[in-house]
């Protein structure tokens, strides 16, 4: 005898059974089974969910979001700015060349509204500013010669000298003297600044749709000389008063001019290219970009200097710390045009999403309904095709679904064999042959239904009234596996 194979441990056997079951289930085919449940509450929930999904796709997806269009964001853009106006301080008139930085104009332009001037600076030695950390001193030993403070104005000489005013002392530095804050002068330029005008020329291009447009109307050449922007009357005259921009951003002009700030001019080009070109118009909005209530980062200022020589030898400069209103022009937008591909994709998504209602109602049906076990039994069937069906018995869907027992392929002990000819009682008119010896019937729907019903009744031990073939509806038994509740 062959040696017995060693038995696998219980864990290994369980893993093998699990793997075998997973492998077998992997090749199963699942198909939906239609069940009609006559329950108005469940039907109401189903239709309401479908209606909400349909409204969402029709109103929001297709009307609001215009998902039937192919879109392009981030248009190619060019910006040119030009500022005009004059102002004056206590003793000086300021024109555009002095208070606008940079002078060439672009997407960013700064308009100076207040300055701190340190005039006549020359290279030499002088007291360090008291604003510099650890610049105050009492003795020369408090100042280290050659020390360089990156937040300061120069290199320390090692001497402790009196400050520009008062009794305090600071370390002496080698720098442009006098240093800032020592002898600075303040000048306010914002008195007439609200009346400054800013021309913003903008043109955009959507390369996907080969569409271009600008924010200036094609009118007479002198049109821009006599107009200012108005959303209703002159939307294509992009000349803005500085006071109007600050007001639209919700800021106080005097406060903003004193401390400085950053204002964004946002131009939005949202264009529906299915409409005419005249419907594609720029929309302007204004808001402050720097944090207003953060003392460490609010405001806007920068420094620059003007250099000149005295007697052709000594180089001097005037240092200017400028506070101003910086204008940032920001352009964005989106263009859309009808396209067949996104339309088909979104329609398919909408039709698929309607099935969510059926999934939700199936979950309610199998979880919360009173007859959930009955519904679960009717909804799920496990089907196995017979390996060796009898050649004399037609394989029907009712047989495969298990609604009738399979026919015996051989006579068993429980079934009597067919009587040989000449033996047994004679079969008169109207007598019925045993099941095993009945001649095969034609595969019509009525005959198949009678066969399924008779076999089911024999299997269940009941005998319903025999229906008349010409009068009865053959759909009382469902050979297609469809259950109706």
From Swiss-Prot:
Keywords: ATP-binding, Cell membrane, Disulfide bond, Glycoprotein, Hearing, Ion channel, Ion transport, Ligand-gated ion channel, Membrane, Nucleotide-binding, Transmembrane, Transmembrane helix, Transport. The keyword Cell membrane applies. It catalyses: Ca(2+)(in) = Ca(2+)(out); K(+)(in) = K(+)(out); Na(+)(in) = Na(+)(out). Disruption phenotype: Mice show small differences in body weight, but are visibly and histopathologically normal for up to 1 year of age. Simultaneous knockout of P2rx2 and P2rx3 results in reduced pain-related behaviors in response to intraplantar injection of formalin and reduced urinary bladder reflexes and decreased pelvic afferent nerve activity in response to bladder distension. Neurons have minimal to no response to ATP. P2rx2 null mice show impaired peristalsis in ileal segments of small intestine. Glycans are attached at residues 195, 252, 311. Residues 420-436 have a biased composition (Low complexity). It is a multi-pass membrane protein. ATP binds at residues 82, 84, 197, 297, 301, 303, 321. The keyword Lipoprotein does not apply. Homotrimer and heterotrimer; functional P2XRs are organized as homomeric and heteromeric trimers. Homotrimer. Forms heterotrimer with P2XR1. Forms heterotrimer with P2XR3. Forms heterotrimer with P2XR6. Residues 1-43, 361-485 are cytoplasmic. One of its GO terms (molecular function) is purinergic nucleotide receptor activity. Residues 322-335 are annotated as: Pore-forming motif. Belongs to the P2X receptor family. It comes from Mus musculus (Mouse). It is found in: Cell membrane. The gene is P2rx2. One of its GO terms (biological process) is urinary bladder smooth muscle contraction. ATP-gated nonselective transmembrane cation channel permeable to potassium, sodium and calcium. Activation by extracellular ATP induces a variety of cellular responses, such as excitatory postsynaptic responses in sensory neurons, neuromuscular junctions (NMJ) formation, hearing, perception of taste and peristalsis. In the inner ear, regulates sound transduction and auditory neurotransmission, outer hair cell electromotility, inner ear gap junctions, and K(+) recycling. Mediates synaptic transmission between neurons and from neurons to smooth muscle. The chain crosses the membrane at residues 44-64, 340-360. Residues 469-478 have a biased composition (Polar residues). Fast activation by external ATP. Exhibits slow desensitization during prolonged ATP activation. Not sensitive to the ATP agonist:alpha/beta-methylene-ATP. This is P2X purinoceptor 2. One of its GO terms (cellular component) is receptor complex. It comes from the Eukaryota.
